[in-house]
């Protein structure tokens, strides 16, 4: 192991010990907020400590075996030492690989919940139906992760699905798992209204944004906002409310427009719209920072229309993610079994981070 990495691990090891001791003090035990904060910090480095401790233990066994090999004359002891050296060397190599991945820079947003926006793009009615299919897919995946889904804003489409839907998913490390879902999703299938059996191609754009919590301050000048109220509407623009409870907020400097009409009160819709706006402004800044990263990692959070990231081919029961040349059966994915593709995307992210780390040395 490189000295620099070993020293970093020793510092983390010491920090872990200090935090464990601090957690047992009366001051922290009597302060629930601080207790939870420190417990969370301990949990965030516990896996590194567990692997590093195994590394240290096996390193000691290895050194002892090497000493026996040098000092002992007994053939049986020498043979046992050789076996020990081979075993420990293999273990240590595996621990080093694990630690290399565990020590990679963490995305500060990985722990956050997400706000997902899906819009119908090319394809008219079929694109809107596809938006509905994607929403169901993410909802089923969230259910499988014991995560909560809350619709923040939606516009029903006459033929089915949505022209646009914005929803929040809350759970454990949701952003880390869904951040690479952003981009253009393309569907190829025979629409229910197609009498000639021809395959149509439609698209929907997905944008995954980290939900902004109270700790992050997003400064928005009230004079930069244009706020309009109107009556909420259903599919086809039909009014479903007799009061102006729906809210549209335009952030003039960025041109971002957000709407909310699903809450019954204007106050509730304004609160939701402001939450979406803050996440969009934060995500905009995040994309600027990510331009400095690798081509693959900068895709996180971007819903640019030019980025056709994935194709859902119904006739061939095939899903293809074009960024990593990953193909699998479509049916389980559209039913919410997203983990295989999420894991493949995260593996690609780790590979690029490792390569980037080596390039910077």
Swiss-Prot record:
Signal peptide residue numbers: none
Post-translational modification: Methylated by PrmC. Methylation increases the termination efficiency of RF1.
Subcellular location as annotated: Cytoplasm
N5-methylglutamine: residues carrying this PTM: 238
Keyword Nucleus attached: no
Gene3D superfamilies: 3.30.160.20, 3.30.70.1660, 6.10.140.1950
Zinc-finger is among the record's keywords: no
Pfam families linked: PCRF, RF-1
Alphabetized UniProt keyword annotations: Cytoplasm, Methylation, Protein biosynthesis
Domain of life: Bacteria
GO MF annotations, alphabetized: translation release factor activity, codon specific
GO cellular component: cytoplasm
PANTHER family: LD18447P
Role according to the record: Peptide chain release factor 1 directs the termination of translation in response to the peptide chain termination codons UAG and UAA.
Family per similarity comment: Belongs to the prokaryotic/mitochondrial release factor family.
Protein name: Peptide chain release factor 1
């Amino acid at each position: 192991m490189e000295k620099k990495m070993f020293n970093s691990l020793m510092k983390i090891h010491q920090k872990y010990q200090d935090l464990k001791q601090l957690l047992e003090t009366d001051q922290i035990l009597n302060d629930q907020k601080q207790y939870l904060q420190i417990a969370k910090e301990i949990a965030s480095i516990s896996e590194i400590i567990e692997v590093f401790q195994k590394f240290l233990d096996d390193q000691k066994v290895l050194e002892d075996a090497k000493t026996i090999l040098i000092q002992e004359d007994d053939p049986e002891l020498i043979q046992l030492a050789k076996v020990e050296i081979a075993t420990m060397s293999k273990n240590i190599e595996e621990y080093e690989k694990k630690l290399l991945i565990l020590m990679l820079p963490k995305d500060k947003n990985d722990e956050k919940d997400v706000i997902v926006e899906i819009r119908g793009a090319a394809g008219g009615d079929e694109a809107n139906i596809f938006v509905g299919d994607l929403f169901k897919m993410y909802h089923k995946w969230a259910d499988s992760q014991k995560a909560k889904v809350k619709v923040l804003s939606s516009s029903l489409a006459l033929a089915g699905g949505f022209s646009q839907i914005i929803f929040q998913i809350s759970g454990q490390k949701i952003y880390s798992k869904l951040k690479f879902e952003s981009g253009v999703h393309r569907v190829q299938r025979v629409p229910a209204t197609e009498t000639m059996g021809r395959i149509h191609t439609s698209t929907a754009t997905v944008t995954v944004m980290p939900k902004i919590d109270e700790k992050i301050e997003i400064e928005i000048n009230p004079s930069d906002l244009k706020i309009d109220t109107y009556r909420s509407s259903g599919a086809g623009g039909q009014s479903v409310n007799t009061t102006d409870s729906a809210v549209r907020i335009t952030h003039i400097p960025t041109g971002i427009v957000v709407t909310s009409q699903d809450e019954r009160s204007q106050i509730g819709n304004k609160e939701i719209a402001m939450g979406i706006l803050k996440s969009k402004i934060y995500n905009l800044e995040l994309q600027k920072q990510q331009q400095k990263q690798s081509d693959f990692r900068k895709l996180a959070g971007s819903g640019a229309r030019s980025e056709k990231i994935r194709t859902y081919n119904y006739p061939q029961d095939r899903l293809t993610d074009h960024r990593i040349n990953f193909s699998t059966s479509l049916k389980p994915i559209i039913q919410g079994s997203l983990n295989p593709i999420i894991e493949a995307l995260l593996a690609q992210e780790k590979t690029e981070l490792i390569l980037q780390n080596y390039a910077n040395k």
